[in-house]
Amino acid sequence: MIKKKNSPADKYLIKSQIGSGSYGNTFKVTHKESGQVFCKKSIQVNNQENIEKVLEEGKILTVMDHVNVVKLNDSFFENGNYVIIMEFAENGDLFQKIENQKRSGKPFSDFEIMHYFCQLVIALNYIHSQNIIHRDIKPKNIVLSSSDSGSGSGSGSGSSNDSIPLLKIADFGVSKLMSETDLYANTTAGTPQYVSYEICNKKPYTNKTDIWSLGVVLYELMTLSLPFDGRKETVMRNIQTESTIFKPVNHPNEELSSLLFKLLNKNPESRFSTQQILEQVFIREFIENHMVDFYKRFNFSIDGIFKVISKKLNLAGLNLTKEEKDNLEHKFIFTKMQEMKDRMKAFDTNHINKNQQQQSPQKLENNNNNNNDNNNNNNNNNNNNNNNNNNNNNNNNNNNNNNNNNNNNNNDKNNNINNNVNYNVLKKVSVELGFNLDNYCYDTDGMLIELVRSKLEGKDRKTYSKCYNYLSNKQSAFTNTNNEY
């Protein structure tokens, strides 16, 4: 008997739940061996839409390497969910920071506003250089790390780097990875109070939509209020129709106040890019005078920040550096998930309802085109065809009974899996690979098979030759119903 290997999830101890959403939950966890604290994000992947989101977020986090962006530490499958382990920000988020300032009745100092804003510009400049649109920039998605690599955060009321936390942009769940030739997106995404004019009007948009959101965050830092607030419908209508998008900001920093008009400009073409923001003299002077040493505390250099950052990402197919290849073993999961998405698209066109007990169009076509061959098939192969066509003989009846028993045994947990895949054979494959298929629930055959594929990834071909032979190609993986394994 093959001993079941420990799950990657066993390495982490859940301390508390941080949040929840329509696609999954987030937890504060501790690595059992090192004691290091992480953020665990568990995402459901039980349909193709969720797979698309996980695939996109996975690609993005894999290539992200910036001190102002949350880092990916690990990723794996757990009970039908895809799990991302990220660094944990111990000081909450910018939303909580703003709320604390409101309660205290004290506005942020000019130094704090400039420092926070410049950190966000530097972070967005990097993100946009990777052809990524975040699409949900807001205080809740900006987390606060310590004010020093080895110390806690200060009170946040002074004019020194010692009191300034390191900001990190988080949550790439609705982010978009653009190609170098297609720079426009058109999917509605974001939070109403921070969403751009073009998205409100359902127009195609570029990464300039993030600049609008950045402008809203800057407005909030300067005034402790939002340029638009209220119910979703009211906010969207105001952004769509108002000629003056926000009230003048009564703030001593006139340069920042003027910059707001370049960020919250309804015309994306006239809206500043991150590079244009960095080119502003007062921004550049602040960064050079106050932020170089700040970043050195985190072993990060911003030399060359005023130049266009070269793209690390080859969008024709993620071109990872040697270090990334060595350190990010989980990158194979994203390749596998891309294959999963493609297979599911092909498979779902022939997907049939189990209760209908009908043969798929693909099989009917195969039967018509290969009738003579089918007549000569062995009894095991005939079994599945006869099952669908209700033509039974003694041998086929025995095999049909076996298949019916397998379906009944797994009906509770996998009631959406149809007869195109022999569940019993996949279960034997899973046992040989050291996990229990009954612990997983999937809506389609393609997803069930891809679970087995993911477990087989990297295994020795000689040792697991039967598994590889069974899952050798898409056709056999989706249509093989032979009981012999």
Curated annotation (Swiss-Prot):
One of its GO terms (biological process) is DNA damage response. Its EC number is 2.7.11.1. Residues 366-419 have a biased composition (Low complexity). The gene is nek1. It comes from Dictyostelium discoideum (Social amoeba). Gene3D superfamilies: Phosphorylase Kinase, domain 1 (3.30.200.20), Transferase(Phosphotransferase) domain 1 (1.10.510.10). This is Probable serine/threonine-protein kinase nek1. GO terms for cellular component: cytoplasm. It catalyses: L-seryl-[protein] + ATP = O-phospho-L-seryl-[protein] + ADP + H(+); L-threonyl-[protein] + ATP = O-phospho-L-threonyl-[protein] + ADP + H(+). Belongs to the protein kinase superfamily. NEK Ser/Thr protein kinase family. NIMA subfamily. Residues 354-365 have a biased composition (Polar residues).
